């Protein structure tokens, strides 16, 4: 029976399978098998025992149902795994879990799950980067109105919008590589982190286990890998979500009926409303923005998991069972949705131009002021002169430049040709160069494998 929407509505099957309870069990078994092999290599247990444990440390031998049956009796999840594995290993079962504490297995298995999940996140981020780069290149010269405080400001370009998001996605990719160094760690240090239970060969055993599993050993732990590591991971996932939220919010606003410069794709048979047949709602970007709120909220319990009693208590455990799979699956849904939205993004050039001229050149107040300053009027005086003209044009619903032509204060410094050259399309500064620089940087990072 599916209860949580991540079971049936959100996320790809690929990501959900990683956090499926059967795969989680397999990762725990993988760690137990690696531990047995390490013990055999240092001479602590027979090689034959390590071989049998390794062969049977999988869900074909160790059934999830049996693990649950044992746990229901003993009320300890990892000991249930140990008992179930030991049962199928016969006489060799006595070597299962030798020297380990539960979180040697749990934290190391978690690192394996996180590693698989981050591989999907990285792939999606790089695909999203490619889409944004193409959009930035294609729309490098698509001039539109820039808005600050929800009001028309001065012109910008769609190339700038996409390059801004592109640069942010690139930063996330770079953060991800740095993050993996700190997050993809495991431990074989025993009950309080001293490794006393592993004897003189403790460091060698831990090294062998981590090399076997493709992880690094944490430098120091108590009973657990410290949860600042998980908090950083959850913050990273939320930070990526915030970028997708930002993108979704902008697209939703630009899709408003009265703006309608762009629109997320809308299928031929898609229904927008159960009662309003005409509706073309931005449901994909709304979903992205909504799911982001869940990822933001999961950062708080991740932070609260860091301070625990002494060498460790159990209050982090139940929380992590929820926030780790939930955050990864929901971010997976968000990334894949945003890729679809951007790939099918629809543009309305006539509305982009209409909005650019909607204020009847009030948006040219800044370049008009700067032109006056360039011609000799003091900057502060020019600001006040243009401000008064802009207010007059607004009150009278007239074109600012037409009002300016009637002003002696303006014509004293500027010719009619000077005023005619003040067009929104001409006032985008270094937008093209900025976009090109971002693209060049991203391409350089791609060549470096980042």
UniProtKB/Swiss-Prot annotation:
Reaction catalysed by this enzyme: N(6)-(1,2-dicarboxyethyl)-AMP = fumarate + AMP; (2S)-2-[5-amino-1-(5-phospho-beta-D-ribosyl)imidazole-4-carboxamido]succinate = 5-amino-1-(5-phospho-beta-D-ribosyl)imidazole-4-carboxamide + fumarate
Keyword set includes Cell membrane: no
GO cellular component terms, A-Z: cytosol
Residue positions of the active site: 149, 273
One Pfam family it belongs to: ADSL_C
GO function term, MF aspect, one: (S)-2-(5-amino-1-(5-phospho-D-ribosyl)imidazole-4-carboxamido) succinate lyase (fumarate-forming) activity
EC numbers: 4.3.2.2
InterPro entries reported for this sequence: AdenyloSucc_lyase_C, Fumarase/histidase_N, Fumarate_lyase_CS, Fumarate_lyase_fam, Fumarate_lyase_N, L-Aspartase-like, Pur_lyase
Example GO biological process: 'de novo' AMP biosynthetic process
Amino-acid positions noted as binding N(6)-(1,2-dicarboxyethyl)-AMP in the UniProt annotation, renumbered to this chain: 9-10, 75-77, 101-102, 223, 274, 279-281, 318-322
Pathway named in the protein's UniProt entry: Purine metabolism; AMP biosynthesis via de novo pathway; AMP from IMP: step 2/2; Purine metabolism; IMP biosynthesis via de novo pathway; 5-amino-1-(5-phospho-D-ribosyl)imidazole-4-carboxamide from 5-amino-1-(5-phospho-D-ribosyl)imidazole-4-carboxylate: step 2/2
Record key words, sorted: Lyase, Purine biosynthesis
PANTHER family reported in the protein's UniProt record: ADENYLOSUCCINATE LYASE
Subunit organization: Homotetramer. Residues from neighboring subunits contribute catalytic and substrate-binding residues to each active site.
Stated role: Catalyzes two reactions in de novo purine nucleotide biosynthesis. Catalyzes the breakdown of 5-aminoimidazole- (N-succinylocarboxamide) ribotide (SAICAR or 2-[5-amino-1-(5-phospho-beta-D-ribosyl)imidazole-4-carboxamido]succinate) to 5-aminoimidazole-4-carboxamide ribotide (AICAR or 5-amino-1-(5-phospho-beta-D-ribosyl)imidazole-4-carboxamide) and fumarate, and of adenylosuccinate (ADS or N(6)-(1,2-dicarboxyethyl)-AMP) to adenosine monophosphate (AMP) and fumarate.
Family membership: Belongs to the lyase 1 family. Adenylosuccinate lyase subfamily.
Protein name stated in the entry: Adenylosuccinate lyase
Organism: Pyrococcus horikoshii (strain ATCC 700860 / DSM 12428 / JCM 9974 / NBRC 100139 / OT-3)
């Amino acid at each position: 029976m599916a209860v949580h929407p991540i079971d049936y509505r959100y996320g790809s099957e690929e990501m959900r399978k990683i956090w499926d309870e059967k795969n989680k069990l397999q990762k725990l078994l993988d760690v137990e098998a690696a531990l047995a092999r390490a013990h055999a290599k240092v001479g602590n247990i027979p090689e034959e025992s390590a071989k049998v444990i390794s062969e049977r440390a999988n869900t074909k031998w160790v059934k999830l149902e049996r693990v649950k049956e044992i746990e229901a009796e003993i009320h300890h999840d990892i000991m249930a795994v140990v008992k179930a594995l030991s049962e199928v290993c016969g006489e060799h079962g006595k070597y299962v879990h030798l020297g380990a504490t539960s979180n040697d297995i749990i934290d190391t298995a978690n690192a394996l799950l996180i590693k698989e999940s981050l591989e999907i996140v990285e792939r999606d981020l790089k695909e999203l980067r490619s889409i944004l780069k193409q959009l930035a290149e294609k729309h490098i010269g698509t001039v539109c109105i820039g808005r600050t405080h929800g009001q028309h400001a001065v012109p910008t370009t769609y190339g700038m919008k996409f390059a801004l998001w592109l640069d942010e996605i690139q930063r996330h990719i770079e953060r991800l590589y740095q993050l993996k160094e700190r997050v993809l760690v495991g431990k074989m240090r025993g009950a309080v982190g001293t490794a006393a239970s592993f004897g003189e060969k403790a460091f060698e055993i831990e090294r062998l286990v981590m090399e076997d599993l493709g992880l690094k050993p944490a430098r120091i732990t108590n009973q657990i890998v410290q949860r600042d590591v998980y908090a950083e991971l959850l913050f990273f996932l939320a930070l990526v979500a915030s970028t997708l939220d930002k993108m979704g919010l902008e697209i939703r606003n630009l899709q408003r009926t009265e703006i309608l410069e762009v629109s997320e794709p809308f299928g031929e048979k898609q229904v927008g409303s159960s009662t309003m047949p005409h509706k073309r709602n931005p449901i994909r970007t709304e979903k992205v923005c909504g799911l982001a709120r869940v990822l933001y909220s999961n950062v708080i319990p991740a932070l609260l998991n860091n301070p625990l009693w002494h060498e460790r208590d159990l209050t982090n455990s139940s929380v992590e069972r929820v926030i780790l799979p939930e955050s990864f699956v929901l971010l997976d849904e968000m990334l894949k949705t945003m890729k679809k939205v951007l790939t099918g993004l629809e543009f309305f050039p006539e509305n982009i131009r209409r909005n650019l001229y909607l204020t009847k050149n009030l948006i040219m107040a800044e370049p008009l002021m700067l032109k006056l300053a360039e011609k000799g009027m003091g900057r502060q005086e020019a600001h006040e002169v243009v401000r008064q003209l802009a207010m007059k044009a607004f009150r009278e619903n007239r074109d600012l430049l037409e009002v300016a032509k009637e002003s002696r204060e303006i014509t004293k410094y500027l010719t009619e040709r000077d005023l005619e050259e003040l067009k929104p399309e001409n006032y985008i500064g270094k937008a093209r160069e900025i976009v090109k620089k971002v693209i060049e940087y991203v391409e350089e990072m791609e060549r470096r494998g980042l």
